[in-house]
Regions:
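His-Asp-centered metal-binding catalytic motifs of divalent-metal-dependent phosphohydrolases/nucleases
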Residues: 58-83, 91-94, 116-127
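Divalent metal-dependent phosphate-bond-processing catalytic cores, especially two-metal-ion Mg2+/Mn2+ enzymes
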Residues: 7, 29-34, 38, 42, ...
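An active-site-proximal "capping" alpha-helix that borders the catalytic cofactor pocket
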Residues: 39-47, 88-103
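Primarily interfacial, aromatic-capped hydrophobic alpha-helices that serve as membrane anchors
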Residues: 100-107, 177-180
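Short coil/turn segments at secondary-structure boundaries
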Residues: 81-89, 105-109
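Short, Lys/Arg-enriched N-terminal segments with co-localized hydrophobic residues
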Residues: 1-5
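Acidic/histidine metal-binding catalytic segments
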Residues: 52-63, 104-122, 136-143
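Active-site flanking loop/helix segments enriched in acidic
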Residues: 13-39, 71-84
Length: 180
C-alpha cells in the first residue's frame, strides 16, 4: 500500500452539510438528527482525546461520529420513524448507503479505514458489540457507541429539563445566602 491519506475532517463536515440539504431541515426529526450527529461527532473527538489517541485515530473517531447515523435520513424519509423495529436497522442501512452506494468516497478518498468505519457503524446500535474485531476496530466501535449513548442520555434528560423547566435560565440566577 502507498501512503495513507490523512483524514480531512473539515472536508467531511462540508460533505455532510451538503448531504443533509437533501432533507427538509424544518422537519423536527431531521433537525433533531442533525444536531444529534454534530454533538456525537464532537463527543467522539473528546473521547478519543481523553484516551490520548494519536491524531489519525482522533480524526477517525470524529469521522465515524459524523457518519454513524447517516442511514437515519433515508429511514425518516421512507418510513417517517426512527424506530428500527418498525422500519430498518439504521446502522446496517447507513453502511449500505456509504459502502454499497459509494457515498463514503465523498467523505474520505482513502479506503484503508473502510473496515473500521463499517464495523463501528454496524455495531453502534447493537445491544452487544460483535466478537472477532481487531483491537483498533473494537476501540472505535466503543468510542462511537459511548458517544452516541452519552448524547441520547443528554437529549432524554438534560435537554428535556432545559426545554421543559427553563433550567438553563435558572442556572444563571445568583446564589445568595437568603433562605426562601
Amino acid at each position: 500500500r502507498g501512503v495513507i491519506e490523512m483524514i480531512d475532517i473539515e472536508n467531511a463536515k462540508r460533505v455532510f452539510k451538503e448531504y443533509v440539504k437533501n432533507y427538509n431541515p424544518n422537519d423536527g426529526k431531521i433537525a433533531l438528527k442533525i444536531s444529534h450527529i454534530l454533538r456525537v461527532t464532537q463527543k467522539s473527538r473528546e473521547l478519543a482525546e481523553e484516551l490520548n489517541l494519536n491524531e489519525e485515530d482522533t480524526n477517525l473517531a470524529e469521522l465515524i461520529g459524523l457518519l454513524h447515523d447517516i442511514g437515519r435520513f433515508e429511514q425518516v424519509r421512507i418510513y417517517n420513524t426512527f424506530y428500527d423495529k418498525d422500519s430498518i436497522n439504521h446502522g446496517e442501512y447507513g453502511v449500505k448507503i456509504l459502502f454499497e452506494d459509494g457515498l463514503i468516497r465523498k467523505f474520505i478518498k482513502d479506503d484503508s479505514y473502510d473496515e473500521i468505519i463499517k464495523k463501528a457503524i454496524l455495531n453502534h446500535n447493537r445491544p452487544r458489540i460483535e466478537e472477532g474485531l481487531s483491537k483498533r476496530e473494537l476501540m472505535h466501535a466503543k468510542i462511537i457507541r459511548d458517544a452516541d449513548k452519552l448524547d441520547i442520555y443528554y437529549v432524554l434528560t438534560i435537554e428535556k429539563l432545559e426545554n421543559s423547566y427553563g433550567c438553563k435560565d435558572m442556572s444563571k440566577d445568583e446564589i445568595t445566602d437568603e433562605i426562601y
